[in-house]
Amino acid sequence: CGASGWQVRGCVWVKLKVKATGRTVYFFDTHYTHDPEIMDADGNKIFNIEPRRKASEILVGESEAKVKGGNAAVFVTGDLNCARSDGATRNGPRSLEPLVEYMWSAREDAKYYDGAISFNGFDPDYDKASGNIDHIFYRGAEAQEFITVNGHDYGVYFISDHYPVTCTFIL
């Protein structure tokens, strides 16, 4: 799905069928490029958001092609390396715009959101909203409870520099 930094990025997906109803569910998981920096004419580093935006466009295009106007539920999850609110730093609003126009954000639309930040950078005091770079987008379902799995009962304080995110849905 459109790459720059840290080399080629991929997307895995699966088509599922709910036995009880016969309804189709598509699930996509990806990891967008990290800090795709380029240099401007004066040699200053600037962020190139186009690889992330292109990845969002590809995901939406693939989703639309698979659903083809049907009633399938679609989920896109992953470390998208930008937040909806990060403004100029990584320009998440522009990078994620194709997804936001086609789908909903589980973090923003779930009936319950725990308010926790998903990225921690191995820093116990990290609490910037721009750290919400791990996303669940959806279409054709109803988001119930969005949880960032940040408990400290794993035997170590940090299980990763990102906490897993989960959401319960009604199809």
Regions found by a protein language model. Name each.
Residues 1-171:
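Active-site regions of metal-assisted phosphoester/phosphodiester hydrolases
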